[in-house]
Amino acid sequence: MLNDMDFIKTCDVPGPTKEAIRAIILYKSAVTPNDEVVDVGCGTGGITCEFAQRAKKVTSIDTNPDAISVTKQNLEKFNLGDNVELINDSGSNALKNIDNMDIAVVGGSGRELEDILEIIDSKLNPKGRIIVTAILVDTKIEAINKLKKLNYNPKIMEVNISNGRVLDRGVMMISENPIAIISANKR
């Protein structure tokens, strides 16, 4: 796992997804060296960088050109990227041109979540996996409901990570924002 502190970050681009959350996403995805992964809403590229080390191909999509730039910088910093394609476009537009995917991770949908999930469903390989991360309650509900309509059996977990800061007289736990991880396998 890459260390959160090693990522290049900017104020204008969210991320990276915290290390513990990336670890859960990797576990839930059951990624193999033969998998083709799509990362929708790549932000600073935390998910992209982790999958680039483990999958055959990663396609990373973001509407924000700064996000694509920071993701590229992080890939270069970690000597990754030979198997990564970066696309600066909306998720729904970019996904229409991708024909093969085993794993789709949606970390940012730009209010297009239902459309994005429909397109992913139509292109996801048999036994493919979908993972949606969400901090907004509305996004969690929207993802669950849409996946159910698409005949998936989604599972949801909400993760609250706290990290300790060592002080002179003890350890203080500092909480991160809770995040939901919604996962579903194609039947």
From Swiss-Prot:
S-adenosyl-L-methionine binds at residues 17, 41-45, 62, 91. Pathway: Cofactor biosynthesis; adenosylcobalamin biosynthesis; cob(II)yrinate a,c-diamide from sirohydrochlorin (anaerobic route): step 8/10. Keywords: Cobalamin biosynthesis, Methyltransferase, S-adenosyl-L-methionine, Transferase. InterPro entries: CbiT, Cbl_synth_MTase_CbiT, Cobalamin_biosynth_MTase, Methyltranfer_dom, SAM-dependent_MTases_sf. Belongs to the methyltransferase superfamily. Archaeal-type CbiT family. One of its GO terms (biological process) is methylation. This is Probable cobalt-precorrin-6B C(15)-methyltransferase (decarboxylating). The lineage of its organism: Archaea, Methanobacteriati, Methanobacteriota, Methanomada group, Methanobacteria. NCBIfam families: CbiT (TIGR02469). GO terms for molecular function: cobalt-precorrin-6B C5-methyltransferase activity; protein methyltransferase activity. It catalyses: Co-precorrin-6B + S-adenosyl-L-methionine = Co-precorrin-7 + S-adenosyl-L-homocysteine + CO2. It comes from Methanobrevibacter smithii (strain ATCC 35061 / DSM 861 / OCM 144 / PS). It holds the Pfam family Methyltransf_31. The keyword Transferase applies. Its EC number is 2.1.1.196. The keyword Transferase applies.
